[in-house]
Amino acid sequence: MNWLEAFILGIIQGLTEFLPISSTGHLYLGRHLFRLDEAGLFLDTMLHIGTLLAVFIYYKKEFIYLIKNPFSKLMLLLIVGTIPAVVIGLLFKDFFEDISKTGITIGWEFLVSGFFLYMADKQKNGRKKMDDITYKDALIIGSFQAAAIFPAISRSGMTIVAALWRKLDRETAAYFSFLLSTPAIVGAIILQFVDVFQGKAESISSTSLIVGTLSAAFFGYIAVSWMIQYLKRHSLKVFAYYVWGLGILILMLQFTDVF
């Protein structure tokens, strides 16, 4: 893989990690387009590190607070919200990944993701701020995050949807969703590094790794800041229409040699 392909995949990862359209699903598509297959596993890991850097930079004040106050309510909310994804991920990760490596399943997953995004906008706007979030809210939002074990189900999309259903206001829904993404991204990095050290990934140039990581970090930061502002006043339906269109296109492409 050359550095330009890594740069493009970094853009895809950075933008789609925080827009509710599934980064993993888009990376699967990117692999097929570039014919990368498992050769891109190590790069995938570095791309996740890039998006993790984006979250750390954007939320630097919050993470400094968490380090200084490890037993704060915010820390406990993040722990509670992470539990469902940890349990589901450890028990069923390989199973769900194996059944989701075909264009048919990825296409249907995009369609399902679009349904949740569309339905979320039918809810009345909530008024809960960060201080109003309960542990029950965090657990329910985290349970929706666990659904993103399916590659084309958007993690940020599901958590934002759940947060809106739990009556968080729109800005807080995105804000908490992206904070909650941190342990999920860390977990994904750890699991991917295990696969890398087990020899499941081919070598890739250091230039491509650096370019891909920095690209993911830069565009990830842009996506986080833009999405929080966008959701204040705009609908999620545009993302629902996008993933519906993408899902239908992928299903139609089953009649070609793309998948």
Curated annotation (Swiss-Prot):
Entry's localization field: Cell membrane
A Gene Ontology BP annotation from the UniProt entry: cell wall organization
Other noteworthy facts: Bacitracin is thought to be involved in the inhibition of peptidoglycan synthesis by sequestering undecaprenyl diphosphate, thereby reducing the pool of lipid carrier available.
The family this protein is said to belong to: Belongs to the UppP family.
Protein name: Undecaprenyl-diphosphatase 3
Alphabetized GO MF terms: undecaprenyl-diphosphatase activity
Membrane topology field: Multi-pass membrane protein
InterPro entries, A to Z: UppP
Record function comment: Catalyzes the dephosphorylation of undecaprenyl diphosphate (UPP). Confers resistance to bacitracin.
Keywords: Antibiotic resistance, Cell membrane, Cell shape, Cell wall biogenesis/degradation, Hydrolase, Membrane, Peptidoglycan synthesis, Transmembrane, Transmembrane helix
Pfam families assigned to the protein according to its UniProt record, in alphabetical order: BacA
Broad EC category: hydrolase
HAMAP family associated with the record: Undec_diphosphatase (MF_01006)
EC number: 3.6.1.27
Keyword Cell wall biogenesis/degradation included in the entry's annotation: yes
GO CC annotations, alphabetized: plasma membrane
Membrane recorded as keyword: yes
PANTHER family: UNDECAPRENYL-DIPHOSPHATASE
Transmembrane segments: 1-21, 39-59, 71-91, 99-119, 133-153, 174-194, 208-228, 239-259
Main location: membrane
The reaction(s) this protein catalyses: di-trans,octa-cis-undecaprenyl diphosphate + H2O = di-trans,octa-cis-undecaprenyl phosphate + phosphate + H(+)
